[in-house]
From Swiss-Prot:
Lineage: Bacteria, Bacillati, Bacillota, Clostridia, Halanaerobiales
SUPFAM superfamilies: PLP-dependent transferases
Function as written in the Swiss-Prot or TrEMBL entry: The glycine cleavage system catalyzes the degradation of glycine. The P protein binds the alpha-amino group of glycine through its pyridoxal phosphate cofactor; CO(2) is released and the remaining methylamine moiety is then transferred to the lipoamide cofactor of the H protein.
Protein known as: Probable glycine dehydrogenase (decarboxylating) subunit 1
EC number: 1.4.4.2
Keyword terms of this UniProt record: Oxidoreductase
Species of the source: Halothermothrix orenii (strain H 168 / OCM 544 / DSM 9562)
Signal peptide: none
Family: Belongs to the GcvP family. N-terminal subunit subfamily.
Subunit structure: The glycine cleavage system is composed of four proteins: P, T, L and H. In this organism, the P 'protein' is a heterodimer of two subunits.
GO term, biological process aspect, one: nucleoside metabolic process
Listed Pfam families: GDC-P
PANTHER family for the chain: GLYCINE CLEAVAGE SYSTEM P-PROTEIN (PTHR42806), GLYCINE DEHYDROGENASE (DECARBOXYLATING) (PTHR42806:SF1)
Length: 447
């Protein structure tokens, strides 16, 4: 409905009805020392032209990937997005963040979500996927809660090789539910498997690893699979970058019970703060513990194929005590974007993106490792991200590269006790851009 403000007479009638003299009486329970009393500093209204100028001026302070050459990763990646994707998702019948509430009236949207789920299952090797969560971090948190419900255990072993933001989100989700999080240390840039073996016991509800991990290193999931298979009701959660799965073995082959990840790489642009896309897939026997919505295919009484919301285990649809999640906003538009991207690229295209990213990263790492004062920490075991030790503090390296128009990487000392620079390449980076980065490093280190 249209918003129409209340008139003074309407306000007076409402106040009289509830038995108070003025609006201020409604706020008397608020302590006086925390009550905001000074006037709001709100400027006068602007015309449309003035407002556009103001917004453009503020937006000009942002730096886009068109203005800087991006060699940063750590959870958000600068991949090429085919031009037609934005056109298709902007169609009026698609352009909303929500899976439809009157599902049967929106067969096209539901079919798109069904295709998205099917392609996520094909990438991960899992049996069922939901129609999206908020982002990679929230998907990790939901996976931990889901694993605890299934295993009926509270102890969670979580590798320090997982994106540190994801780890913090998972703790935020799990601690109010009484979950106990125990970190698994690192052997350089991979999970310490001996420590995993020592800490893994019958009380462990889940083991969580990332593949490739935050440093770009590829964990030995065969070892993890063998360790967990000897335990009853201990689930394996694997956090993935879906674009690497065109080259790497799918998590299902390592016995994964729940697979989650960030779907930004599947056609969604880099945005500070999102919106991004949470991916989740699991085994069929766990489907009723999966949060979010699941679209299924069926036939009507005439034998015609149709799409329905098969499961909606959220608190808005069923009793709160039985709900698996209270997730409210749904990233349906981002999932649609991912579906169009995967359909556009196909198996061959997704594999090529992964291979190009891999080869360019290894070319770059080999060159950096040969430079005086630089060392690639995980040069023998990474996908398209790697950690380098630099002759200057990583924060300084990053700032000086930024002045040259290069987003050079991430300073991992923000989250870890060692100084390292996390560098990433994707299929977008050209030989000239990589060589320019290397030249910039040489100049910076020699100053």
């Amino acid at each position: 409905m249209d918003y129409i403000s209340n008139t003074p007479s309407e306000k007076e009638a409402m106040l009289k009805k509830i038995g108070v003299e003025n609006v201020e009486d409604l706020f008397k329970p608020i302590p006086d020392d925390v009550t905001f009393k000074r006037p709001f500093n709100i400027p006068p209204g602007l015309s449309e032209l003035e407002l556009k100028r103001m917004i453009k001026s503020k937006a000009a302070r942002n730096i886009s990937m068109e203005e800087q050459i991006c060699f940063a990763g750590g959870g958000a990646y600068d991949h090429y997005i085919p031009a037609h994707i934005d056109h298709l998702i902007s169609r009026s019948e698609f352009y909303t963040a929500y899976t439809p509430y009157q599902a049967e009236l929106s067969q096209g949207v539901l079919q798109a979500m069904y295709e998205y789920q099917s392609m996520i299952c094909e990438l991960t090797g899992m049996e069922v996927a939901n129609s999206s969560l908020l982002d990679g971090g929230s998907a990790t948190g939901e996976a931990v809660l889901m694993a605890s419900r299934i295993s009926r255990k509270k102890k969670i072993l979580m590798s320090r090789g997982i994106n540190p933001v994801y780890r913090e989100v998972a703790r935020t989700y799990g601690r109010p539910r009484g979950l106990e999080f125990i970190d698994l240390g690192l052997n350089e840039t991979v999970t310490d498997m001996e420590e995993l073996e020592q800490k893994l016991d019958e009380d462990t509800g889940a083991v969580v690893l990332q593949y490739p991990n935050f440093f770009g290193s590829i964990e030995d999931l065969n070892v993890v699979k063998n360790l967990i298979s000897a335990r009853k009701r201990t689930l394996l959660i694997i956090v993935v970058n879906p674009l690497t799965l065109g080259v790497l073995k799918p998590p299902a082959e390592f016995g994964a019970d729940i697979v989650v990840g960030e779907g930004q790489v599947l056609g969604n642009p880099i945005n500070y703060g999102g919106p991004y896309l949470g991916i989740m897939a699991t085994r069929k026997r766990y489907v009723r513990q999966m949060p979010g919505r699941i679209v299924g295919a069926t036939t009507d009484s005439d034998g015609k194929r149709g799409y329905v919301l098969t499961l909606q285990t959220r608190e808005q649809h069923i009793r709160r005590a039985r709900a698996t999640s209270n997730i409210c906003t749904n990233e349906a538009l981002n999932a649609l974007t991912a579906a169009i991207y995967m359909a556009t690229m196909g198996k061959k295209g997704i594999k090529e993106v992964g291979e190009q990213s891999f080869k360019k990263a290894h070319y770059m790492a080999d060159r950096i490792d040969d430079m005086e004062g630089f060392e690639v920490v995980n040069k023998d075991n990474f996908f398209h991200e790697f950690v380098i030790k630099t002759p200057l503090p990583s924060a300084e390296i990053g700032e000086r590269l930024k002045r040259k128009g290069i987003l050079g990487g991430l300073d991992v000392s923000r989250w870890y006790s060692f100084d390292g620079f996390l560098v990433c390449t994707t299929e977008k980076r050209t030989r000239e851009e990589i060589d320019g980065y290397l030249e910039a490093l040489e100049v910076i280190s020699s100053d």
